[in-house]
Amino acid sequence: MKALPSTKERFALALRELLESNSFESISVGDIVGLSGLSSRTFYNHFRDKNELLAYLYRITVEPLWYTDGKRNSLETFFTCCKDNFHYNGTLKGFGNALSYYGQNDLRSEIENKGVEDLVRLLKWNHFPGAITPELREVLRFFMCGITRYFEKYYLDSKTIQVDWLYTFWINCVPAYLAEYLVKEPE
């Protein structure tokens, strides 16, 4: 028997559905609440605003892409999963509608923050010998910023730019002492 979605997941599913055909700015909390079948009070008991819900939706959508058949993916496989989820099954497509919003709690910031945490986790998984310092996190953030800007350009330019080479390009730009631990295949 399949478990029912949690309250947070119900709001996230409603937002995902709305993002398929609407810009993020045009979606109101009332729209999300109406589609979810829950109350505004329940929404605000779980989220500060729709931006926090969008961040939650992003996290629960991307986290499973790190794993295939219960095994951890390499960074290259993760990039491929993200690309495939954008192109083929539309899982990530709705997020493109939210990239045009700049402001407090914007999706871009969430992608960069989650990306840094994912890369730190990958370094730890691959037994990176150095300390995870604030400076190291800033190096990783710099590269995550580049990826989000490229993805945004790709989305806004009607997919005229190829993303197939993004992993190779990105990993060649990362300092070698980090790249070695980011590209290792899972043990």
Predicted feature locations:
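Short hydrophobic clusters on alpha-helical segments that form packing/core surfaces
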Residues: 7, 11-19, 115
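DNA major-groove recognition helix of helix-turn-helix
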Residues: 11, 15, 47, 54-58
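Helix-turn-helix
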Residues: 18-52
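Short glycine/proline-centered loop/turn elements that form peptide/ligand docking sites
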Residues: 23-29, 50, 129-135, 180, ...
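Short, basic, alpha-helical segments at the C-terminal edge of helix-turn-helix-like DNA-binding modules
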Residues: 28-29, 57-66
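Hydrophobic alpha-helical connector segments
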Residues: 67-97
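Amphipathic alpha-helical packing segments from all-alpha helical-bundle domains
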Residues: 103-130, 134-149, 179
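C-terminal peripheral helix-coil segments that are non-catalytic and often amphipathic
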Residues: 153-187
